[in-house]
Each structure stands twice: as C-alpha cells, then as structure tokens.
C-alpha cells in the first residue's frame, strides 16, 4: 500500500501531469495507435487499446513479440510500449521496427533509465517496487499502469467534449 501511495503522490506532481499532457498531444496528432506489451504488460496493452478505442482513438494491441514489421502505410502511427523492466529484448526489437517507419513512441515503464525509455519520444515512469517470486514470476502491481491509461483517456474524453 505504501508504494501505491507514493505513486499517487507522484501522480499529483507537475512532471507527471506534463507527461500525461504530452501523451494526449501525441495521441491526438496520430492516425493510428498500436499498444505493445508481453506477459502482464501485454494485458495492459490490450486494456489500453480498448480504452483508447472506446474514447474515439482507434487502437490495436500487439502481445506477440514476433509480429511482422510495420509498413510505410503507418504514417503518423503512435506506438505505446508497456514494459515493467524496460529491458525486454523482444519489445526492444519491435521498437526498432517502428522507429524505422518514423513512428512516435511512448513508453510506460517502471524504469525511466531503461533501454525502452531511452528509445522513446516520451516515457511515463511509475516507479513502483518490483515484486519477483523465487521462480522469477513478476507479481508487481499494475495499478499505476491502469491509472496512467485511464488518466490519459479521461483527458482525451474531456478534450473531445
């Protein structure tokens, strides 16, 4: 609970709000949104794609790290990458593909200094303690990620009305 309280305190700050505003700008300037993630992050990508579509910004999700490369038809495509570690090789490989077709990239990650964050035009970090079970299963809270998605979508909804 303490780590969630710390995140929500951070979410009230100027830096976080600037990140949300920049994400909204990238979304409204794009023609197409792709949400990408693997594992738990893939579930967050799917949730985000549905929520963006629900508020009028058509989006698809990719949770298959071997999905084919985007084509030149992806003009003004926005890729939103979800990754707790920010170091998942397959997600990094996908970011390289999207960077190759001049897509804007937003990352939502727990590590603002990660490879994925450095490859992104905008990173929205959430700084929550990682919880890894002995058999290497990540059970870190995804509450901050859901909050970020919903915060962006509420702002998009407000702008449309």
What are these regions (language model features)?
Residues 2-5, 21-24, 146, 150:
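Amphipathic alpha-helical segments that line or abut small-molecule/effector binding pockets
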Residues 1-19:
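HTH-adjacent hinge/linker in prokaryotic transcriptional regulators
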Residues 18-30:
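Glycine-rich phosphate/diphosphate-binding loops that line cofactor/substrate pockets in enzymes
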Residues 28-160:
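Glycine-rich phosphate-binding loops that contact phosphosugars or nucleotide phosphates
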